[in-house]
Amino acid sequence: MANIKSAKKRAIQSEKARKHNASRRSMMRTFIKKVYAAIEAGDKAAAQKAFNEMQPIVDRQAAKGLIHKNKAARHKANLTAQINKLA
């Protein structure tokens, strides 16, 4: 454990940020899973609706640095391609 006051404070802040980031990451993954579930079900309308809900969430997390911008772009591109493949 840290002995210096500033190091103790950083440890507390770091733990708080870790919990906050974990919550945001979990939320983002849930939205992505909803899109995959709709694609698996073969429901294009539901998949498109879920994608439209997921897109701003993923973009926001990328802008805040929670995930890399390329990862956000990759998720969106892959899901868009799969949705377009549905008849």
Curated annotation (Swiss-Prot):
The keyword Ribonucleoprotein applies. SUPFAM superfamilies: Ribosomal protein S20. It comes from the Bacteria. GO terms for biological process: cytoplasmic translation; ribosomal small subunit assembly. GO terms for molecular function: ornithine decarboxylase inhibitor activity; small ribosomal subunit rRNA binding; structural constituent of ribosome. One of its GO terms (cellular component) is small ribosomal subunit. Residues 1-26 are annotated as: Disordered. Belongs to the bacterial ribosomal protein bS20 family. Part of the 30S ribosomal subunit. PANTHER family: 30S RIBOSOMAL PROTEIN S20 (PTHR33398), SMALL RIBOSOMAL SUBUNIT PROTEIN BS20C (PTHR33398:SF1). Binds directly to 16S ribosomal RNA. This is Small ribosomal subunit protein bS20. It comes from Escherichia coli (strain K12). The gene is rpsT.
